Amino acid sequence: MAIIFNPNKKIFTLQTAHTTYQMQVDRLGYLLHLYYGAKNTCDMDYVLTYADRGFSGNPYAAGMNRTYSLDTLPQEYPTLGTGDFRNIALDIKNEHGTESVELLYKSHEIRDGKYALKGLPAVWASDDEAQTLEIVLGDDIAGVEVHLLYGVLEACDVITRSVLIKNTGSGNITIEKAHAACLDMVYGDYDVIRFYGKHAMERNLERTHLGHGTLSFGSRRGTSSHQYNPAVILAQRDTTENAGGCYGMLFVYSGNFSCEAEKDQINQTRLLMGLSDELFSYPLAAGETFTVPEVIMSYSADGFSQLSHQYHTCISEHVCRSRFAHEVRPVLINSWEAAYFDFTGDTIVDLAKEAASLGIDMVVMDDGWFGKRDDDNSSLGDWFVNEKKLGGTLSELIDRVHAQGVKFGIWIEPEMVNEDSNLYREHPDWAIQIPGKLPVRSRNQLILDFSRKEVRDNIFDQICAVFDQGKIDYVKWDMNRSMADVYAGNLAYDYVLGVYDFMERLVTRYPDILLEGCSGGGGRFDAGMLYYSPQIWCSDNTDAINRTRIQYGTSFFYPVSTMGAHVSAVPNHQTGRVTSLKTRGITAMAGTFGYELNPALLSDEEKEEIREQIKTFKKYEMLINEGTYWRLTSPFEDEVAAWMSVSRAKDRALVSVVRLYAEANAATYYVKLKGLESDAVYIEENTGRQYTGAALMNAGIPLPFATKEYEAYQFSFIRLDEAKKLYDEIKKVCGNLKLNEADTADSASDNRIVISIYGGSGSGKTTIAAALQQYFLNDNTACYVLTGDNYPHRIPMRNDEERLNVYNESGEDGLRGYLGTPKEIDFDRINKELSEFKAGKDIIEIKHMGREDGDISYDETDFTGIKVLILEWTHGGSEYLKGVDIPVFLESSPEETKARRIKRGRDENAASPFICRVVELEQEKLDLQGKNARIVVGKDGKVYEQ
């Protein structure tokens, strides 16, 4: 069980896979916090210490005991008016103006499954994935009951917290402050990491040492805001990406919030997260219940990367509900930076035609399609289609776009209204305003009062009337201002619940519409929004260099699959910076990927590059979105921004690097990878170079010398699973051979084996042989790779000429009698070398052949201590070859062989009819030789003995 209650000590223990959270009901009935950190099974009540500290109050129930004080004890949910003078989680005012609530334990319940919150987004899980602990605390005199909710997701290493506040008295009360979670630590040397920003530059990481006093941040803007994200990390001073302890709190809420970190008089630490108490004063009548939104907590003993992975898993698996969360999503192009307000229906159709030709999946018609909306001064609230502007109905436009083979998306901003709109003229009171005062404008618009159901219903009906006109595939929901005219203490909270109600109705009615959140970019990028929309436009800033910072900060809590990221035009519309299309593409691939530009203005070369970009993204999309994301550098500190995605099986990895700064004669920069298997062998797709996982993680890969500023690179690594499977199979076949033991005079020949790797040209013989050699070396078995390309009688060019001569003189039968026989191959030579190796000879003269006339040599090679000789060669299964112990055949077809030969570009005549026929004849012989193989590597990657 994830939740355990010790009735003797009244200790609650919450266990996840790697963490433990513990609290205790003490003898006076107070709920004290004991421990949160790395997993252990000990009762941690010994951490509580008691001392007589001046000016620290003592509860009356403690009698004359001056060592007992809530001002110094670690509490689970501290309240105002109890003698605790630190920051508190709850402040309630009664109808007489008194602010004092003393919460004592009443009861608890442990149940399977994860609690849900009425009207609020929250982590969800099945009954076998989570458990819930509900602890009831109360103050009978104040008439208040507080239900502390804990959700334990064991596999995710996540604990969620929420609070229900009930008015159990007969009069009214007012909630002045309500936080969802408090974490009290009996020690106090921490750093606080927060994510600050501004419009078009969100979620910059800032790390601050927590000194005495309070460090606080939050939002009073009505949204979670561009300025501070509702997320915090409390870290040990020496914590890095890969080591050290750190705690995370993430608020599942899209409105005003507050986070407070305090180091008190005796160096203890308190961390609070919840609703902002500014512009908040919530009345609660007798019998009513108030719900505090949820906080997701997690702890990592292994640095920030592990903490991020825990949050990424929780959000992607237990917050995002959309069916699109784990599906391939469309590559889209948005009309905004292509046309802004200046477009017609034909403009959108032309954009769709261009998109289809580039391989883009969807066109999104952004702001300007409704009412009389030709600028940002009018028509918000009037959600009817401007058919004059579009040149027809929306249904007709959607059909025209779909006819181009692309999907159709549309932009909305339901929460806003312009004063120049029919809606405002009919219902001016529906806009949020302080009675008797003129409202604060922003972007020439006001906010509709979504706390009122009749307002929501009107807009919902308008929006549905639009959506029902045709098959809309995608909706971008925007929100382009902050809330200023807060006329009541309950408004900000009720407004957010109204937005959630609207979104719930929308996604329920249109489950097949992909919904993307937006608030001037990343002004409402939070877990609350992700409950309804699986992705959010990360920032209005599409500059590739700025985006490395924005996406870096975002990644600490939110998975890549949630980050809307697009390639935009240059000079960039926000910064004026010019970066290459390649750099813009690589940066946007660290998100949902799309385009914000006018393709009609692109050159043919740029269009072709975009086609290749899209192919690349689609090749790696599931790896990027479903893989484990690793930050390799910090764009705030390093000269490059580097990140990577590793598949869950660790068999594939994609590394992306952007040079942020360059200088003359710079030192070579090495990027160290993460998350790979140390002993596995990986091949880099573009170069064919092989590495062990340990080498990539410990030594890294060098960037090309003289990398230019803003230049970008991608490296794709594939684990050579066939080689590992082959190695394991060979070990079985080898039986009792002691290959990793030193030779004796009698054993040198007995313990030597020859393995041949053979198959069609380009079938991967060289790759598998090199990887197989590495696996032997990993096992302390010395191994040598011999290439059969050294053993024809003639260099490659002359051999091709001889093949053609034979064909011209003797036809196909003569060519068949030449290929792979002693007429073409010096079998005597290679058999001699293999025989000497098997006999235990240490110095063997090995033949080497180049590609130019006369480029043939014989070099003495030291085989001392070498136990395994791997021969990689097309003819490694030939009847003329002697001394092979384990022949291994790589299956391939002539078509595959031809395609590989052409792709590798080593032979300029690879596609000629004659060479293709040679390949077919060789394959005929290989198919026969394959029957003699001891081990076969199938085209499906399976390895089996025959």
List the predicted regions and their residue ranges.
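Polysaccharide-binding surfaces and accessory modules of carbohydrate-active proteins
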Residues: 5, 10-13, 17, 21, ...
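Carbohydrate-binding surface patches
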Residues: 241, 634-677
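Conserved nucleotide-sensing/catalytic segment adjacent to the nucleotide-binding pocket
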Residues: 784, 793-850
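ATP-dependent NMP and nucleoside kinases share a basic, alpha-helical "lid"
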Residues: 856-904
